[in-house]
Amino acid sequence: FQKITKQDVVDFAQKFFQKNYVIVKKLRGENENLIRVENPGITPVKINREAQSEFLTEILHQKSSEITPKFIDYKNMIEETQIGDKKISFVKNKYNHIAQLHLIYKIGTDHDKELFLAVQVLQYLGTSRFSADQLSQEFFKLGISNDFKTYDDQMIISLTGFEENLIKGFELLKHWITEVKPDDEVYESTIELILESRNVAKKDKSRIMTALSHYAKFGENSRFRDVIPEEKLRATKVEHLTEKVKNLTQLPYEIFFYGKDFERFKEKIQPLLEKATLTIPKPKIYQELETQGKVFFTNYDMVQMEMSKIGRASQLNTENYGKINVFNEYFGRGLSSIVFQELRESKSLAYSAYVNYSTATYLDRHNYVVSYIGTQANKLHLAVDAMADLMQDLPQIPTQFNNAKNSALKQIASTRITRTNIFFIFFWSFLIILNIY
């Protein structure tokens, strides 16, 4: 790349980017020349699930070795220690010299709505020693990348790069957080980006569907509606947000280190850790409402239509994971599911259709049954009736059910939990089973 010159790029463009292009014009307004074709009607195709072609028979008779599942012994794979008030977990990297350091805070936007805003602004701010661009260069020199992820109930700050420079990267991160310099112009630009993204989201079909789903579950008091209003965004001082960033070193958090030399890491990290002096505020609770058969409608300018039904089910029971996986595989999701085959392949009533039994994140929260139909407006009533028939009288097809069970078992057998996933899967499972939150 260093050998490529500006003239090389110009020569390439002049040689290849000539008149070998296509112009596509998208016109706005009503099409006065639109030709409508009368719906000829579609005769349902009878699906013969028992039939096998010669090709399929040949494949099924080919012997293949069974995949043996590999289960993780988390107690042996994850080493834990305590330095001061900081719990530190370690998983050994057996593959390369790229290490990872994760600071895991048990605070998220449910605890503090301004936290995400503060972290977002931080990305464009410098310090007393470095501008924002210079900070990026300093991380680059170390071969370290940083990442801030904010969730509803936690935040994770991550460093990834050469293990020999990871501690220097942590020192630079601490400097950035504790010495961050407020900048009014940067904050004003960030506000405009946030407001622009909100306006774009209001026109995004998938975002609207997600927002409607949240409204069906939580009503007026949903996370989608609970955002910082524009007036408060503009009234907030950037200094208020940088103080929140500086407080991150004083909040309690735990550490996950993925690398080769844990002893060296503990020795080097210990002098840089500070005892937490602040406490985490209580989270706002978004109460899940009982679903009561209400209909919510959004008038969106589109040729097709989409409809979801959402029903609140029982609270999470981890013993039902296997049954739920088989149900979704057999009945609701995927190209081989009953719903997809009946509504799309057999009756051509939808371009997409599924039923999903979705599990809750924590033990004290509810599962949901979600059905979805994407179809033409004139087919909606037929598709809804067909979906209702399937839901009320679930077809029993032994061969397909056994295939669904085998598929679920093979997914378990073929899944390999490696690298950082060893910790994070255990971490999330630990939260669910013990219901820490």
Placement of each model-derived feature along the sequence:
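Bilobed periplasmic-binding protein-like "clamshell/Venus-flytrap" ligand-binding domains
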Residues: D8-L27
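M16 family metallopeptidases and their MPP-like homologs
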Residues: F1-K3, V22-L27, L34-R36, K94-Q123, ...
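His/Glu-rich zincin catalytic helix
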Residues: I23-E138, L142, S158, E171, ...
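Residue-level signal for short amphipathic helical patches enriched in basic/charged
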Residues: I4, E164, T236, Y330, ...
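A short, aromatic/hydrophobic, helix- or strand-capping loop or linear motif
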Residues: E185, T279-Y286, P398-N402
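Peptidyl-prolyl cis-trans isomerase
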Residues: E179-Y187, T236
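Histidine-acidic residue clusters that define the catalytic metal-binding segment
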Residues: F1-Q14, Q62-E80, H214-E254, T279-Y286, ...
